[in-house]
């Protein structure tokens, strides 16, 4: 992989599947871009690459240049809007049937990932986020070893560990934190996803599971707790259909009114799933202010 022009690499890890690792990667990428940084996302989750779907670029065609595979541009930098560029590369682009999980056995998988890591050309990138397969298997260890070998000293900034309130109660997330210690990867912090539910009718956030476990666990391990993220069905609508999130009158996040103004544009063109508009639509999501804070904390952890 040509990493020469990448400033910082951040891994996104989870001890088990389905906790929202790819959603967190996507939202970190959008928030970093909204903060003006140039961002790359590399999806090596062989268990079912979901990143192309999340960015609305499932049908994108990857091309090859002399320097390697060229990542897909979700949007270019727009300095007048303070937005940085966003590019994505996924193993999913190379699978014959998009969205399939890879069924190869260990050594073939590892060889594929190794080659994939070497063959992608990244242009000027402030943050490269890597969405990894869930778990702490041998496959993970070899992925981490490969990365550590390829990155220059200090380039691999660390890992963001994603969990859910239920997963905290299991051993998986602790295993993930132990995995980081074993592989010498610094933990930048823990995100607790799906810690509550944003009601689509009144936008009240209700804690459906016992929340707070992520923070206790982060304290136990002496790592930073980055924050809690509720389930917002409007985020799912944005990802699945490309529709701009809308909220009833009076909806606030941290005291800020995020309700959809009367007469806001919902034209056909606006509704169309189009990766280049995603970042601007995401700005209207109730999760965006939460991720803006998480992202600021990740940046400060990277720079420490
Ligand atoms: N906070 C959230 N609000 C609304 N939907 C969410 C949230 N977090 C995750 N989801 C949705 O839950 C589903 C699973 O999330 P995601 O694919 O990010 O999990 P994952 O941990 O990456 O899974 P896998 O292990 O299969 O890769 C997705 O449809 C995603 O959009
Ligand atoms: S206030 Fe909201 S969450 Fe509670 S019952 Fe009414 S609509 Fe549902």
Swiss-Prot record:
GO terms for biological process: iron-sulfur cluster assembly; tRNA wobble uridine modification. Binds 4 [4Fe-4S] clusters per heterotetramer. Contains two stable clusters in the N-termini of NBP35 and two labile, bridging clusters between subunits of the NBP35-CFD1 heterotetramer. [4Fe-4S] cluster binds at residues 199, 202. GO terms for cellular component: cytosol; cytosolic [4Fe-4S] assembly scaffold complex. Its cofactor is [4Fe-4S] cluster. Residues 249-271 are annotated as: Disordered. It is found in: Cytoplasm. GO terms for molecular function: 4 iron, 4 sulfur cluster binding; ATP binding; ATP hydrolysis activity; ATP-dependent FeS chaperone activity; iron-sulfur cluster binding; metal ion binding. ATP binds at residues 15-22. Keywords: 4Fe-4S, ATP-binding, Cytoplasm, Iron, Iron-sulfur, Metal-binding, Nucleotide-binding. PANTHER family: CYTOSOLIC FE-S CLUSTER ASSEMBLY FACTOR NUBP2, NUCLEOTIDE-BINDING PROTEIN NBP35 YEAST -RELATED. Heterotetramer of 2 NBP35 and 2 CFD1 chains. Component of the cytosolic iron-sulfur (Fe/S) protein assembly (CIA) machinery. Required for maturation of extramitochondrial Fe-S proteins. The NBP35-CFD1 heterotetramer forms a Fe-S scaffold complex, mediating the de novo assembly of an Fe-S cluster and its transfer to target apoproteins. HAMAP family: Mrp_NBP35, NUBP2. Belongs to the Mrp/NBP35 ATP-binding proteins family. NUBP2/CFD1 subfamily. This is Cytosolic Fe-S cluster assembly factor cfd1. It comes from Neurospora crassa (strain ATCC 24698 / 74-OR23-1A / CBS 708.71 / DSM 1257 / FGSC 987).
């Amino acid at each position: 992989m040509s990493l020469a022009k990448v400033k910082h690499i951040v891994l996104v890890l989870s001890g088990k599947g389905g906790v929202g690792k790819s959603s967190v990667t996507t939202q970190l990428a959008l928030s970093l871009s909204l903060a003006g940084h140039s961002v790359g996302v590399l999806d090596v989750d062989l268990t079912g690459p979901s990143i192309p779907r999340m960015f609305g670029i499932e049908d994108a065609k990857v091309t090859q240049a002399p320097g390697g595979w060229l990542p897909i541009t979700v949007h270019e930098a727009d300095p007048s809007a303070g937005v940085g560029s966003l590019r994505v590369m996924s193993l999913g682009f190379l699978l014959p049937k998009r969205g399939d999980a890879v069924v190869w056995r260990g050594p073939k998988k590892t060889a594929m990932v190794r080659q994939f890591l070497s063959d992608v050309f990244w242009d000027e990138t402030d943050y490269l986020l890597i969405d990894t397969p869930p778990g702490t298997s041998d496959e993970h260890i070899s992925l981490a070893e490969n990365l550590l070998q390829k990155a220059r000293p200090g380039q691999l900034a660390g890992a963001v560990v994603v969990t859910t309130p239920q997963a905290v109660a299991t051993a998986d997330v602790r295993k993930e934190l132990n995995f980081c210690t074993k592989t010498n990867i610094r933990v930048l912090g823990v995100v607790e996803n799906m810690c509550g539910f944003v009601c689509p009718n009144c936008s009240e956030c209700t804690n459906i599971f016992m929340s707070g476990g992520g923070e206790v666990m982060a304290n136990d391990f002496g790592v930073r707790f980055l924050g809690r993220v509720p389930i917002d069905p409007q985020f799912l609508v944005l990802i699945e259909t490309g529709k701009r999130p809308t909220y009833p009158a009076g909806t606030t996040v941290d005291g800020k009114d995020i309700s959809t103004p009367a007469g806001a544009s919902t034209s056909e063109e606006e509704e169309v799933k189009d990766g280049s508009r995603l970042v601007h639509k995401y700005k209207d999501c109730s999760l965006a202010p939460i991720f803006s804070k998480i992202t600021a904390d990740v940046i400060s952890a990277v720079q420490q």
